[in-house]
Amino acid sequence: MAFASLLHHIWNHAVDCAEQLTWWQTIVSFIIFCIMCSWLPGNGEMRAPFVGYRWPFEPTFWVRMRFIFQSLGMMTEGYSKFKDSMFKITTNDADWLVLSQRYLDDLQSLPAERLSHTDALVTMWGSSHSPFALLNKSDLSSRALRDVVAPNYAKDLDSLVDELRYSLEHDIDIQDDWKPIDALELSSKLVLRISQRILIGWPMSRDQELLECAQGYADAATVVQFALKLLPRQIRPLVYPLLPQAWATKSWIRRCDKILAKEMQRRQVLEKSDPVYEKPKDLLQGMVDLEPSRPVDKLGHDFLVQALISRMAPVVTMAQTLVDLALHPEDIEELRDEVLQVIGPDGAGLGNLRQSFTKLDKMDSVLRESARFTPLSMMTMHRRVQDAKGITLHDGVHLPRGTHVAFPAYHIGRDPKLVSGADIYDGLRWYRKDLGEAQENEAPKHRFVTPDSNYLTFGSGKYVCPGRFIAEHMLKLMMTAVLLRYEFKWPPGVPVPEQQYRHVFAYPSKTTLLIKRRKDGDQIL
């Protein structure tokens, strides 16, 4: 009791002192605290050169803050000096060890017990004090996506066509005259509908309340994620509960819990009363079947986090691809002709979409080129060493436990020694390369979803992104519809946007295009 009284007295005294501080004193105190936090060790045991410091005594907290807005320049400096070895970047999340691609074979197949991808992703996405921290507590939604959704969704691609048509008719307002449309907003609306159809099926894919939950949670979680990245990780536990968006995420989760519980009750009634009822192979059903002990009214958080993760790459990739095509209009007709040839003027190819999509070689090339030229994340294959003994690489370099490693996907894809003409966007680059290298009856090697040592958008090895085929089918379906239904171009007189990154994430600064309907464009899809 005496100790509790002492703590209470100290707390009250601290509050009284804080109330007497002026704004200037508060700001100075915060800066001093940040400087003190910057002295705390990161991956201090791992010896490698740091990059990003403009002068020897630049405060570390300031370097970490600059990384949020100047990460591309810092990474370019590091890659130009140490691309054949390794270097360190300091961030508010952790100190990251950026590795040369020659270490891929050492790490890409190690088990999670030795090299965790989940721990590293949680750190990269905003630390343990963010909505994504759930991934360290529960892998239920990830297992359901990998084991239930991914193997089964393609059996009913016709349903995605139905959902896409519904979205184009109800969510998108494009007329016969040229009209400015934000490509990011367009892709976000389409992806939201289609991803919901994949993750929870019909009729819930059109449940307006669930759609609002998915979008509302995504908006709030994204704000929380980037707000926390501005702060030293030592004070995130204090700030996180004070963010209005943090409270909003919890509100959306509670609403989603109720919606999913009601849907599971409906399914359970059907399962008992309808002898021909078949359980859907979607995310919700997968989570329930994989973990029957979990209360059905406690699945909202898992569902919303997985829904957000599943949408991020398709939304940005779709928008970036449309921008790239608008800036290189010579590729648009090439793609449109290919789509018409594969789908057919009467839409016969829609009857077997899975097979039709494998024939869209030029579209594969354009998607891959956009992902190479402007990857969603500047660094991929984030991993955290979990092995208590650490990990020793092939050349004797030792990675101690706790080391956060990643590979510079952006700069590997832009390295002229690895990719010819790497600084030039060439939409049909991979199509021509496959034509030149392919043997008789050999499938193309440079698909959008096919990773290799020079193309790490989806990672590599044992933990390559399990949802990449879902993303591929979503993107090809949406691109097919846009090419058939609409004309689009870059607005005349608007300068070409510079590539920008915030932290490690692509930040499309200008995505507004001019779009109009094509005559009879909706007759096929």
UniProtKB/Swiss-Prot annotation:
Pathway(s): Secondary metabolite biosynthesis
Known glycosylation sites: 136
GO biological process: secondary metabolic process
One term under GO cellular component: membrane
EC main group: oxidoreductase
Main location: membrane
Keywords assigned by UniProt, alphabetized: Glycoprotein, Heme, Iron, Membrane, Metal-binding, Monooxygenase, Oxidoreductase, Transmembrane, Transmembrane helix
Cofactor(s) essential for the protein: heme
EC number: 1.-.-.-
Sequence intervals crossing the membrane: 21-43
Phenotype when the gene is knocked out: Does not produce lolitremanes but accumulates both simple and O-prenylated paspalanes.
Positions with a binding annotation for heme: 465
Membrane association type: Single-pass membrane protein
Similarity comment: family membership: Belongs to the cytochrome P450 family.
PANTHER family per UniProt: CYTOCHROME P450
Name assigned to this protein: Cytochrome P450 monooxygenase ltmJ
Organism: Epichloe festucae var. lolii (Neotyphodium lolii)
